[in-house]
Design a protein with these regions (language model features):
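Non-catalytic surface loops within mature trypsin-like serine protease
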Residues: 35, 117-119, 138
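Cysteine-nucleophile active-site neighborhood
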Residues: 51-124
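Cationic, amphipathic, low-complexity alpha-helical segments enriched
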Residues: 128-129
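N-terminal beta1-alpha1 cap of cysteine-dependent amidohydrolase-like domains
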Residues: 1-79
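Secondary-structure junction/capping motif
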Residues: 9, 15, 118-125, 135
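Single conserved hydrophobic/aromatic residue that forms the stacking wall/gate
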Residues: 133-140
Length: 140
């Protein structure tokens, strides 16, 4: 599998994922959007990963490349059916690209949080793939 990785800041890189990808025989190409690199055609890639970053999805005036990136994500996912992984900002960009709304939370949610799964969410394919669960270890 050959992946296109969109990176928004030098410090927000693929990190440990590079080791896992290499061990499994996958290749990737990183595009540094914050450095002005252009997004290549998706046609030579098998998947799209969009990483995190310090900006917000609505800051197109400060980060003008966000508008082009959102259009690219929409095209890649809707028109081409490219598998997508979004981390932090990446999943927010996907949501907005496909018509969702992303806004600032009233309170920050950092770390492990308890969430409530809605009936609509429970019927989605993401939660139909695996019926396992985990319990986090107690911190010492």
């Amino acid at each position: 599998m050959h992946l296109l990785v969109l990176q928004h800041a030098r410090i927000e890189h693929p990190g440990i994922f590079q080791k896992f990808l290499k061990e499994d025989g996958h290749s990737w190409e990183v595009v540094h959007l914050d450095e002005g690199q252009e997004i290549p055609s998706i046609d030579s890639f098998d998947g799209l990963w969009v990483l995190g970053g310090p900006m917000d999805v609505w800051q197109e005036q400060d980060y003008p490349w966000l508008k082009k990136e959102k259009a690219f994500i929409k095209m890649a996912v809707e028109e081409k059916g490219i598998p997508f992984l979004g981390l932090c900002l990446g999943h927010q960009l996907l949501a907005e690209s496909l018509g969702g709304v992303v806004g600032k939370s009233e309170t920050a949610e950092v770390g492990v949080m308890e969430v409530q799964l809605t009936e609509e969410g429970a019927s989605g394919i993401l939660f139909a793939v695996s019926y396992t669960h985990l319990t986090l270890p107690t911190m010492m």
